[in-house]
Structures are given as structure tokens and as C-alpha cells.
Amino acid sequence: LTIEALNALPHCFRIETEGSFIGMIQQIRVEGSNVHIGRFLINPSLTGKGLGTSAMQLFIAMLFENKRVHSISLNVFDDNPSAKGLYTKLGFKVVATVEGERKKYKMMKSNSAIN
């Protein structure tokens, strides 16, 4: 995936630090009052520095500013425990497990101001 291809994706938000592109978050669909995040990528050389946590916190806050958004969902593969740990730390809870070639979890976070 090139930066040009990322820029062409709908509802794709660039993550930058000090003017440098370091990752992206993409909202892929809205179902009723739920927004589903489809992609969340951080440059692997920059993980473990809190940048992904900060970016996701800002993105969550931005989504919940819209009073019609009551929840946010995403999927995470079982073989990505660091991502699952990040989402859990940010208040996402596993709501479904999908078995398959690669086991994954559907996780959801509710807007605490509403619920």
C-alpha cells in the first residue's frame, strides 16, 4: 500500500508526527449508530512509543463528538495480541469470536456519555 493509494481511500485519516506520515486509520462503514474501523496501521519501527494509542484516542474522541455515533467496532486477529491489548486498554470489549483460517475477534466500544 503506497501513500498515494492510502490518500485515495475513502474516510482514511493520516497519522503524522512532526510532519512525517507514520500511519493511518480508516473508517470503513457506518451501520446505524455504529462506526466500524477497518484499518489501523502504524509504521512498525515506531510502535511501542504511545503514538498508536494517542492516535486512536483522538480518533475515538472525534467519532464520539458526533452525537449519532453510539459505538465503534473493529476486528482484530488472534495472532496480533499487541493490537488486541491496545484496543482493550482503550475500552473495547470482545463481542464475538470468528473462527476460520485466522481466528479473529470483533471488538466494540460504547460511548460512555450515552450508555
Segments and roles (model prediction):
Residues 74-84, 100-104:
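Conserved beta-strand-loop-alpha-helix junction that forms the acyl-donor binding cleft
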Residues 42, 48-62, 85-89:
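Conserved acetyl-CoA-binding loop-helix of GNAT-fold acetyltransferases
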Residues 65-75:
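Conserved GNAT acetyl-CoA-binding A-motif
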Residues 1-45, 62, 66, 111:
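Acetyl-CoA-dependent GNAT
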Residues 105-115:
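Terminal substrate-recognition subdomain of acyl/acetyltransferases
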Residues 56, 92, 107-108:
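Methionine-biased hydrophobic packing positions in alpha-helices, especially
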